[in-house]
Amino acid sequence: MRIAEDPAAFLASLEDREAKGAPVELPGGKMVKRLPGFRRWMWDGAFCGTIGFRWQPGTTELPPHCLGHIGFAVVPWKRRQGIATRGLCDILPEAWAVGLPFVEVTTDPDNTASRRVIEANGGILIEEFALPSGYGRAMGLRYRIFRDEQEC
């Protein structure tokens, strides 16, 4: 969906706390039920990137195809300005509001910038793990940020 076609519908599509959206197509074509979640824009007067949060009601567990509760991306010309660090800090209270005692955030082992963002928010490395097929790389790092140990 393009913003210009229907701005209100586009904005509504960023917020799906009841998982009413269409199923999600995984690499390989398998369709799976959408999880509740929402996406925020990171903004400093201009668009900087997005950060999203998803969860499975009643549990901290995620389906195998969901690598973490939170994902983020910053446009290249806005990197190294603390935007992702602030964005992650800002979204954590919303994670705590759905009752999670911790969130999981994953990254590539060689993505030192994302590792720094996660660690700056209290992330603790819990494992290196093999990614499911279809993700285009072999290994990932899984961090947990605990509600009671959040550092931002």
Indicate residue ranges for each PLM-predicted region.
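GNAT-family acyltransferases
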Residues: 1-76, 94, 126, 131-152
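Proline- and acidic/polar-enriched loop/turn elements at helix boundaries
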Residues: 90, 107, 130-131
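Conserved GNAT acetyl-CoA-binding A-motif
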Residues: 95-107
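Conserved active-site alpha-helix within GNAT-family acetyltransferase domains
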Residues: 110-127
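Amphipathic alpha-helical recognition patches that constitute DNA-binding helices
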Residues: 69, 102, 113
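Conserved acetyl-CoA-binding loop-helix of GNAT-fold acetyltransferases
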Residues: 71-74, 80-97, 116-120
